[in-house]
From Swiss-Prot:
Domain of life of the organism encoding this protein: Archaea
Disulfide linkage: 206-212
Annotated HAMAP family: Peroxiredoxin
Protein name in the entry: Peroxiredoxin
Sites where the protein binds substrate: 127
Subunit structure comment from the entry: Homodecamer. Pentamer of dimers that assemble into a ring structure.
């Protein structure tokens, strides 16, 4: 089972958008790879509709979505068509799901990513989310039980925070939202501590020598 910081396992898979090769087809992009237990299930349907409503928003963030379950591509297609043509939820309807959904009947990809967890199910993937950076490194792993749908806004928030860390080398505090203050890395020497505490900078505030924040300039 891969962990945060590991290389994301490579794979070639049949999907609703044709064959994909990961990571080759996604070089230079952030990827949200997520699994769901089964097609034609209510919680998964709400998740796919919500992801579909946000797919262009994610794409504008240089982030691509890839879905997966242990179902056939024909089941995926039938389910996605039903979602597009028949289902309305929270004002969302007629949603075209443009991102690929992997057929993983032999559980090849699911097992590589630890998406099959026997105490939950031996025949279905759990609700897993892997956020993968442009260098194909795993940056976040999330697991949800079958009964609980994912919070897509939280997934988006994590992507924004990871991208900010990659670009600016800052951290984000608890409950952070884009536009709020970010955390400057703490100094790593006594000299750096003296320099930081003795120097005032516009937009920066220190609660203590190890805890300084600055305004988020890219909102």
């Amino acid at each position: 089972m891969p962990l945060i910081g590991d290389d994301a396992p490579s794979f070639t898979a049949v999907t609703t958008q044709g064959i994909i090769k990961f990571p080759d087809d996604y070089k230079g992009k952030w990827v949200i790879l997520f699994s769901h237990p089964a097609d034609f299930t209510p919680v998964c349907t709400t998740e796919f509709m919500t992801f579909a409503s946000m797919q262009e928003e994610f794409r504008s963030m240089n982030t691509e979505l890839i879905g997966l379950s242990i179902d056939s591509v024909f089941s995926h297609i039938a389910w996605l068509k039903r979602i597009e043509e028949k289902i309305e939820y929270k004002g969302m309807k007629n949603l075209e799901i443009k991102f690929p959904v992997i057929e993983d009947l032999k559980m090849d990809v699911a097992k590589k990513y630890g998406m099959v967890q026997p105490k939950a199910s031996t025949t279905q993937a759990v609700r897993a989310v892997f956020i993968i950076d442009p260098e194909a490194k795993i940056r976040t792993i999330l697991y949800y039980p079958q009964s609980t749908g994912r919070n897509m806004q939280e997934i988006k928030r994590i992507v924004v925070a990871l991208q900010k860390n990659a670009a600016e080398k800052v951290a984000t505090p608890a409950n952070w939202q884009p536009g709020e203050d970010v955390i400057i890395p703490p100094p790593s020497s006594m000299e750096a501590v003296k320099e930081r505490m003795g120097k005032e900078e516009e937009g920066k505030r220190c609660l203590d020598w190890f805890m300084c924040l600055k305004k988020d300039t890219q909102k």
